[in-house]
Amino acid sequence: MARSRARVPSRALSVRLLAAVAAVALLLPASIAAATGTYRNPLLPTIPGDGVVESCADPSVIRGQEPEDDHLWYLYCTTDPLNGQDRDGAGNLVFHAIPTFTSADLVNWTYRGDAFPTRPAWVQGAGMWAPEITYFNDQYYLYYTRAELEGRPSAIGVATSDSPLGPWTDKGDWLFAPDGRWTFDPEVNVDENGQRWLFFGSYFGGIRARELSADGLSTGTAETPITIDNRYEGAEVALHDGWYYLFVSATNCCNGPLTAYGTFVGRSQSLLGPYVDAEGVSLLSENVGGTPVIQPNGNRWLGTGHNTVFEDEDGQWWTIYHAADVNDPYFEGAVGFTKRPALLDAIDWVDGWPTLNGGRGPSDTPQQAPAAQPGDETNHEVRLAPSDVLGPTIWRDDFDDGTLAGWEWVREPATTTYGEADGVFFMETQPADLFVDSNDASVLVRDAPDGNWAVEAKVRFDPLIHGCCFNFVQAGLVVYEDDDNFIKLVDVSIWNTRQTEFAKEVGPVPAGFPRYGNGVVGPTGGATEAEPWTWLRIVKRTNEDETLTGTYGGDELYTAYTSHDGEHWSRGMTWRAEHGEDARIGLVAMGGSGFTARFDYVEVSKVHR
């Protein structure tokens, strides 16, 4: 849990400093605050005498809490190799049990060994994931996930030490007996009454909370649900201006150059919730709430998630999170094994909500560094991201003339399964799909305009009214080049939830590389007849970048927006692509039979900025 700058654990950080603390600062009088330098993502911690660390997933950070800790910051990462050359005598990658790093400035880090040179006996050969470092009872606590292995369930463990560098004394067993649900990603928080709680959980089972014992080594048996299952993991809580902010991550963490992992936020005035997003939708709701906050923005960084937040010595908030580099996604010699370097960016509070760099998203240019030490001042300033402003309408179809003029079919379905009626276009959902080599779904298409544009549709899709579970039945928009190259924004049923999915498929691809990747955006319309509609919008812009070309690059940026009321919009992630003159705008209703999708209108507009 992120806290203020006093002697309390504040978590976070990592990213490569290109120009560290300015040397001129050393010449300033002691009474004058020293300005920090600049840095550029990613962080690449040094290995003394032996290269740099290229992956630091699920980072957790703490400022040293004792005088003997030398005002250093301490960083802990999930079990992974340090880089592609980190191999044993047999040539196998070495998996470190929570690699540990130190820094005086939060940007230049040094590898200091592993928290556990030998894994605890109860962990045996399993991975030790998602460390959580905290301090209370005059000692350090290092919580971690024991990954599933050979039929043993995932569980939460803990070790203690007088020093943030250990040696660590492991409890030797789990904090509580797992029940088969995913018991991942520990996060320790303190409520308004001073009671500590352990947040944990992932997609299978959702995020839950248990009361932590006074000694920090066990929990109560009662659980409080924090988020609905089948959506979030990686909980991180920050207390800011009387509100608890819950940061959580969603989708696939590790899908190489199509990783669309992203971070969302909700807030509550009680630690145990309920947490709601900026639109007032609960993160426990079936039409899952969550305001996008750390999302890919079209530069090289994808998979921006599992973050931690902290406040620096100048009162500026920051976050550290892992990502994937679209140009260099895998460990060397291990195609399919995604590297996750750590990134550092500023959190700017806008109208009571956190934004990353004022809404600009993950940075890939020089940034002002945080104030890591007493007396430092950061030069970071809030610069709000420009908004996508819709211009004149290029064309609009209200589906009220019975003709579908201007549209054509890719694989026309039976004429009894679609049509116009009562001012909507209806289409029965099909037991068909557009997914890798399964390409039998019907797509209603028309040509996309030239230049920058936005397409918006109002969609009704009601599977949750009929209960659970109708997995991956979906309806919505596509930007369609062909069956193997498209962008898709749909309202989709996933187990007991309804979500908005923003996906990309490409082909052909190199051997071992992915063809399909998917992220999620904001909440859908409600799960009742009273509020059934979801608004979907894709904004297309041209943005040339010669460093982002090839199969996973391109000069076109596609950004997703969703709304559950047509007035308040959530801006989601951005995919980069190159569909060119072959791009068409399409409608789909697929993934399973038994439902009817309804489109109230489709409108294409110019985009101004």
Model segments located where?
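Secretory targeting and sorting signals
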Residues: 2-35
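Surface loop/turn signatures of beta-propeller and other carbohydrate-active proteins
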Residues: 36-68, 83-85, 107-134, 149, ...
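Hydrophobic core segments of beta-strands in well-ordered, beta-rich domains
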Residues: 57-90, 112-115, 123, 128-152, ...
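Structural motif
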Residues: 85-89, 95-97, 151-157, 205-211, ...
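Short edge-strand/loop segments of extracellular domains
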Residues: 103, 216-217, 256, 267-270, ...
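Aromatic-anchored, glycine/proline-accented short structural segments
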Residues: 207-270
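Aromatic sugar-binding interfaces of carbohydrate-active proteins
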Residues: 260-350, 530, 539-597
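Extracellular glycan-recognition regions
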Residues: 354, 360-609
